Amino acid sequence: MTVRPILRYPDPRLTMAAAAVSAFDAQLRALAGDLLDTMRAAPGIGITAPHIGVLQRLTVIELSAADGVRTYVNPEIAWASADLARHDEGSVSMPGVTETLERPARLRVRYQDVTGASRLEEADGLLAVCLQHEIDQQIGRASCRERVLVAV
């Protein structure tokens, strides 16, 4: 696989909504592999295709080696808890910039795997935070961007 260049904020592609993936083929699996290699090189724990300029709804997350790699195609939040949790968040597109955000503590995500099979997953803790952050990125919402000028 390949480490690809990561777009840096304020690249306008980072605020554009990504299109749904419709082809579940070798090209999609290769893109997922490139995202994983790029995320590890950054380093980071989550990355979406828009981070590398590909406006498709594909996310790769690896919280730790023990947790393994998770790949989400066309993810969407199906349910979110009313209880909230605060976490510091950053982005591979804005190195060194973090922001403390309050988000739902638990959620259920509907997505497809790289073969196109439909999945439903419950998440809490860091996984819930990472999923919400990356889904925001895919719809063109980069939560930390308002802090960029403070960090520069």
Regions found by a protein language model. Give the residues of each.
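Positively charged
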Residues: M1-R147
